[in-house]
Amino acid sequence: MSAGNMSHDLGPPRDPLAIVIPVTVVYSLIFITGVVGNISTCIVIKKNRSMHTATNYYLFSLAISDFLLLLSGVPQEVSYIWSKYPYVFGEYICIGRGLLAETSANATVLTITAFTVERYIAICHPFLGQAMSKLSRAIRIIVLVWIMAIVTAIPQAAQFGIEHYSGVEQCGIVRVIVKHSFQLSTFIFFLAPMSIILVLYLLIGVHLYRSTLVEGPASVARRQQLKSVPSDTILYRYGGSGTAMSFNGGGSGAGTAGLMGGSGAQLSSVRGRLNHYGTRRVLRMLVAVVVCFFLCWAPFHAQRLIAIYAPARGAKLRDQHEFVYTVMTYVSGVLYYLSTCINPLLYNIMSHKFREAFKAVLFGKKVSKGSLNSRNNIESRRLRRALTNSSQTQRFSIESAEQPKPSIMQNPTNKPPVAAQYAMIGVQVN
């Protein structure tokens, strides 16, 4: 869509340099940042097997869609800024760009919606999430997302073609295949997903708030002591058995079966306290992604609706509408492509392990489990100290008279299982 679509008067072929140059610089920075960030995201996830989790698979899909959106849109967008007409790329490129852009946009919003549902199930219905293979389910959902994105993009893209205004060629809508297609797109791929996401986060927030009330003030105080510890993943090593259990919701449950000599009630209490704080960090990360998505994409859909309804307002208001449309075109264009480089930045800032793996890839170092966990060894000691200090006011050990005494078979070392060890490893948050 171009400003020329609002009037048969195409106007000047280029806006003033005071607008064109800054916008070009912004587009260039977005393109470089987005391409580097999304390609690096894919490489980091692919090379590090410990990051082959459901959440990272969604992130991988998101990076692919963002990269395709940048590749198909920014070069032609910059070309259009410097020369609004004539369109020199031909009809095939015009239609192909529409197909790729619509597919990528649809895949982005569907992916964000999908892993929001994934987080809701993991936090509010953990037993349901553990009953199914999260990784295999994520793969199936991602494949379905891309199929839906392509199928719904084809009718949109097929409407594009080369149109002629006063003998000047432009890329625009030349045929109507689906009536009210852009209105439907706004509802299906923006309003409905955002409503679903907001409702699910509200339910998650209520669930976490109720969990806080159940745990009581002592648990809140303990969580305050854990705030200095990164929560990529917290593992609990119990009674020297050497069996670790992930508290990020992404494990298979094998760690639970390997625990020896422990109290189920105590283990549940420890798991709840540690997992609660880690879940809140995961939640903040996903909320940030969703909020940025809304801020970046709302102007894009608003600009589309203005382009559709503004011409019907009448000739007297046409100039005002054209000014608003022109401003919205620049604002929505910048924010539209800015969304493609925000996701890698958000995940790098909020995930210690991803940040370490990202730096390792950038500096050409081999991505290894040990290199990603070097800092976590220090943080594990901080975690142990925090838990030791908190136990002075309320010990969460199994030294209670209500707990059965461990047998020799349960504790081969014949040491009291109160010697619980806590360790941090660099498993990506799932």
Curated annotation (Swiss-Prot):
Annotated region Disordered: where? 388-413
What UniProt keywords are attached to this protein's entry?
Cell membrane, Disulfide bond, G-protein coupled receptor, Glycoprotein, Membrane, Receptor, Transducer, Transmembrane, Transmembrane helix
Q: Which residues are glycosylated?
A: 5
Membrane topology per record? Multi-pass membrane protein
Q: Which residues lie on this side of the membrane: Extracellular?
A: 1-16, 75-96, 162-185, 303-321
Bilayer-spanning residue ranges: 17-37, 54-74, 97-117, 141-161, 186-206, 282-302, 322-342
Job of this protein = Receptor for the neuropeptide CAP-3/pyrokinin-1 (TGPSASSGLWFGPRL-amide). Also activated weakly by other neuropeptides terminating in the sequence PRL-amide including pyrokinin-2, Hug-gamma, and ecdysis-triggering-hormone-1. The activity of this receptor is mediated by G proteins which activate a phosphatidyl-inositol-calcium second messenger system.
Q: What is this protein called?
A: Pyrokinin-1 receptor
Q: Look up and give the organism this protein is from.
A: Drosophila melanogaster
Q: Which gene encodes it?
A: PK1-R
